Amino acid sequence: MADGNLLGSSTSLTALLPTPSSASLSASLSSSSLPVSPFLAPAPTTAITASIASLSAQPPPPLPATPATMAGWIGWVFSFFFQFIPSVLYSVITFTTITLPTWLFTLFSMSLTFTMNFTTLLLILLAVVSTLGWFVRYRFLNMYSRLPPEPQRKEPQIDLFPDVQGGDSKPGLANYLDEFLSAIKVFGYLERPVFHELTRTMQTRKLIAGETLMLEEEKGFCLVVDGLVQIFVKSTRDGKSGSDDELHHLGAESSDEEHHIDGKQGYQLLTEVKNGASMSSLFSILSLFTEDIQVWDSQSSTSSSSSIAMRAARVPDSTPNSPRGGMDSPTPIFRDVPDPVSLVNENGDLPLVPPLHLEESPIPPTNHAHDRRQHDHRKHHGRKHRKSVHPDIVARAMVDTTIAIIPASAFRRLTRVYPRATAHIVQVILTRLQRVTFATAHSYLGLSNEVLGIEKQMTKFTTYDLPNNMRGTALDRLKDKFIKERDRLGTEEVTKGIALHNPSAGRRRRSSSFMRKDAVLHAKMMSPKRAATVITSDNSYDHDSAGVSPGDLLSTIQQSRFGPRYEQPTPRLRSPLAEKENSHFRLPAMQARNAFHRKESLDEDALFRECILDCIMKAIGLTSSTGEVLRKSSHSGEASPKLLSYDSRRQKAVFSNNAFGFIDPYEGSGDGETESMMSMSVTSAGGTSPVTSLREELRNDIEIVYFPQGSVLVEQGERHPGLYYVIDGFLDVGMPVVDKGEDLVGVSKPATAREPFPTLKRTTTASSIKPSATAANDPRRRKQSRKSLYLIKPGGIQGYVGAVASYRSYTDVVAKTDVYVGFLPRASLERIAERYPIALLTLAKRLTSLLPRLLLHIDFALEWVQVNAGQVIYHQGDESDAIYLVLNGRLRSVLESADNKLTVIGEYGQGESVGELEVMTESTRPATLHAIRDTELAKFPRSLFNSLAQEHPGITIQVSKLIAQRMRDLVERPVTEKGAERSSAGGVQTATSTLNLRTVGILPVTAGVPVVEFGNRLLHALHQIGVVNGVTSLNQSAILNHLGRHAFSKMGKLKLAQYLADLEEKYGMVLYIADTNVNSPWTQTCITQADCILLVGLAESSPSIGEYERFLLGMKTTARKELVLLHSERYCPPGLTRRWLKNRVWINGGHHHIQMAFRLTAEPSHPETKRFGTVLKQRVQVLQAEIQKYTSRRIRQTPLYSAQTPFKGDFHRLARRLCGRAVGLVLGGGGARGIAHVGVIKALEEAGIPVDIIGGTSIGSFIGALYARDADVVPMYGRAKKFAGRMGSMWRFALDLTYPTISYTTGHEFNRGIFKTFGDSQIEDFWLEFYCNTTNISKSRQEYHSSGYVWRYVRASMSLAGLIPPICDEGSMLLDGGYIDNLTVDHMKGLGADVIFAVDVGSIDDNTPQGYGDSLSGFWVAFNRWNPFSSCPNPPTLSEIQARLAYVSSIDNLERAKITPGCLYMRPPIDAYGTLEFGKFDEIYQVGYKFGKQFLEKLKNEGSLPLPEETEEEKKLLRTMAPRRASI
């Protein structure tokens, strides 16, 4: 009560008194209570303390009311500071100095006593320990379960942009110009004056529905502007055509579906021509351009009668356009006086026209009536056989149709006025003829005999023997030189041939710019003298030409920028007869005599080279053909000199182009630098030029090479290295023969480097194990796998068609005997073709005269189609009307499901075909086909297929083989299975997406990325890997240097497209490097031309979207896109890649980690270096290196990886991925037996075999992830051994046991072991591409994981049912992937791996036959196990039966993997070790290492080890471009 009164009094006092007095009172009360008894003290102390606390906790005393005046404000502030703040300070001091010590004294003076028994104490101790254990277990040791969620990256959605193209038919004539331009795109790039010249005489014609047009009677280029026309061909069943003698080429002649046209039977439908398509074929265009070109040189006679007989064997009558004017009975030609009239009219002259008509040439005046009669006869005979460029072809309009016709006269005039442009067009058409018609017939339809027969018949035009005095003793002396050198070198050193030493080789060619300037200077200095020479009398001309050899002739030609230097000067004011008498085009023997007389002081080697060059030049048409065209031009000039002069001035002002001398003789030669790209000019005769002539230049290029018997000069599929002129010996031209077993799938198999180009698939993933280059050169093997076609005898030329027209060889050429050849490189031939269009025109004329009827009709029906990027070629469900062959570009086939989900079925690159199955079965299109980029296609219409099937069943069989192979692939791996597999795997690669990539665009993410250096290093790596047909890179400067300032203008767009298409056809791969700013046309070109786009970014920079990526998205390209991250060190921080990929859903081709040393800013130590000297710089660098050695957490690479194995570099890995030649490593599961994987990988490292992709199952996924993380065997070994030690601990296993509801263990220790190994790393951060597989028991399917946390999916792949619980992933339960597929070779093949090393360490089941009867007693089984005398095998236990049942599907996949092409199956001898014997790490590791060494050594001895060095040797196709020189 007293306490209560005291408390109440204190409270009342507090309310009445000021703060200090109340505080003193409470202090006195508390001090007076100290001597109280200890038993009574706590109560009053507590009460007083409460009062003190209440006093201190109470708010300060109420302040006076807020004053209204300034003095009141000041007083209020003073009262606040002097009352409130001191009271708070006093309360704090009192609590810390009095109250708190009192509490502590009371607490420590208190004594407590607890009494309990041992059981209670033990229970409390267990509770405390369990609580601490739970806290540590679930708070500290369970960090792996608290990682932030990182779901797998989903497959990007396929971009299929709406088709903006209008389709085939456009209404009316509104788009007349568009249709016309699309039709004449076949001519390639046309400059404006050429276009006007070609189209100014164009005519249009209206055809009503059902009207028939006899194309046989149409001499011109026909195209459909509006409407629909059907093209028919006369069936060979009639056999009455004048050009139907080649029935042996055409097979069966029966025709069930024939059409009636004008009451006649025997016509078959070839194709239907729609808007903007040509009714003429490539062959007919060549015929129009080359009407005035001679097929062979009628003046040239060789010293060999056999050659004369060979040339007398004329073109067979079956050829549609065989020029036969007076050639059935060749008459001897006098050496001294060649007949110019026969030269002019041998192919039939043009019809007689008035003299002033510019488009036709009149008959040249002649004084010999016999010549005139002979001319008339030949003219009539030639006209009869040249009446049509469309033999046996009839067109019928299905609807009212408008067609446009460019008459033949326009082409003849174009050839005269613009010969350079004509040669350019002919070059384009020759290229397309090879890529469209020849490649389709040879590689797709199997018409090898027809195609190769053209090259065989071409030898009759190109055989010219050496003069007699260069044979016999001179040839023997030449052979002796080579024999001595061969004996000195040995047989092994001469497989590539021995080249005769050329003393002039060192001074071969000056730079082109120097020669241009020299030529221009000389032209200006010599122009008055040239003019005087032109108008001199015949005597002076005779004097100048007396004793002139062809070499002297060449020296008289001006060498302008693109000028000719091997064409006859054109004396304008001379009669044809006088010109005939003073012709410079002598016969070979006289040429040789003059040459020898002029070169008496030189040795025989130079004479050999000169004679070989003479023969080669005559063979390619640089002889009388040139003179004949010059004479025709002079005739035209004589008939209308003023008009010709005016016309030449007009064309010089607009489009200067003169190859054959169509220029006014008084016109001075302009500056070579100012001429057009197509321009040329010719000087007149008179004097010799000091400028180095083409002849002198080429004579230094001629190599005389010796090849021993069996040497390979040209391989099939190789671009011709040049011309081989056979001096002595025989060359065998043949082709490889596919084995019987491979014949069924030979068409659809990807081609190797030795297969023809282009084939259906040039880049391979199935031809991994190929014999080495030495095996390929084995004569015994060659005899077994090679079919000989024909021989090339001395005097013959090999590679004429291929080298001049830049074709690829359909055959291989082998030395039948020891052979001596003259070799002219392809580069020299290209210079000839550039300066002398007559060479190309002669080749075109010869080709058209030899084309078989079957190829002619195929050429008519094949349509060359140009498709823009993103354009849909056909939609799913459309009627199938054609087969499409990819000439250039890339297509993608997309399947659209009912829920509008798009699935990629396949991608088709250059040389591949699509649509055969639907055409043959006449079904609808199963999927939508669209162009990934700008694409050129050959459209093979169904009507042509039906027509060929009736007359040539072999073609049907060939296509049926292809369809059978594709159906087999479809059965073995259905489309739906692939789609489900990819969607569940999280990966985005498809089986076809990495195949046959021809163009790669290199695009920076943002400005500042060193893409040029990256591109150069990638180019170097591709060169070292050995890409088929080579690789090149393009940047803006390279394009500008080649095409000039109009490269990116509207005018040059077609020119650029054609140039890029030619490059892509010439090289196996083209790199487009976007080294310009974002909005430049070159960046746009790089994007639109790329099959695959590499987005290059700096890993350490910001992962935000860059400006180049925004531009890329705006382009709406559907090309494959891959991300390349450049690292300065060989280390990727965890989570870095995920940040880059998170916002880039358009990356649909994976990513790559590349180490590349780069520096965007200058080193900070450079300024100090200048001020403090080199000593300080060295000290700083040493200290920095030492500090980084101990402080950096990044794993340093040992020299084992980088220095000794250069092919394992990052750029080489990227190069192999792009080429489709990646090396995959598949590691199977098997528990502790998987430790052998470590030894096998070490053996692969020591053998120098690079690994690009790693896939694993169970323990294989663990070992594979360790290797993929760092791409080094050293850290992999240490971490694997540490993990094996944890797994071998029985204490950890025992502590992890739990009640076996789902599994025997909780899985915690297992999780921690894996997590301690990998940490929070993600699969995307691995240096090598990695995946692992699991079994999803929730959805009953297999899944592949290539993104997300490593430890989770490796743990899931290692989860053995019953021992470890399944891991949960997005609601599904994942178990060991080995239950479905323990060796994932099939998926690795789908990722683009060419060679796969598959290591199987799984257990082998006991397959002992059982015979325990129809019922079984468990007691008997138990007794039988312990009975040592029992002869009955022990039946499997219940757990064994369940385990075998779980692995049923895995066994089937394992057997399929063993026979997969390109798979090297390895099984180390580890059957003696159990699944959980992790304690035997060193022992199992040594077993795997020794087995790997022995296995790889065996492969190396067999020649089937895919070492980079051997692969490089296989690609060295140019046998003579770098021959071994011998100074003989």
From Swiss-Prot:
Transmembrane segments: 73-93, 116-136
Gene3D superfamilies documented for this protein: Cytosolic phospholipase A2 catalytic domain, Jelly Rolls
Lumenal topological domain residue ranges: 94-115
GO BP of this protein: phosphatidylcholine catabolic process; regulation of phospholipid biosynthetic process
UniProt main location, coarse: endoplasmic reticulum
Regulation: Inhibited by organophosphorus esters.
Chain residues that bind a nucleoside 3',5'-cyclic phosphate 2: 846-966
UniProt-annotated location(s): Endoplasmic reticulum membrane
Pfam name, any one: NTE_Ploop
Motif (GXSXG): 1256-1260
Record: active site: S1258 (nucleophile), D1376 (proton acceptor)
Cytoplasmic topological intervals: 1-72, 137-1528
Membrane protein topology class: Multi-pass membrane protein
CDD domains listed in its UniProt record: CAP_ED
UniProtKB keywords: Endoplasmic reticulum, Hydrolase, Lipid degradation, Lipid metabolism, Membrane, Repeat, Transmembrane, Transmembrane helix
Top-level class of the enzyme under EC nomenclature: hydrolase
Residues holding a nucleoside 3',5'-cyclic phosphate 1: 686-805
PANTHER family: NEUROPATHY TARGET ESTERASE SWS, NEUROPATHY TARGET ESTERASE/SWISS CHEESE D.MELANOGASTER
The name this protein goes by in its record: Lysophospholipase nte1
Organism: Aspergillus clavatus (strain ATCC 1007 / CBS 513.65 / DSM 816 / NCTC 3887 / NRRL 1 / QM 1276 / 107)
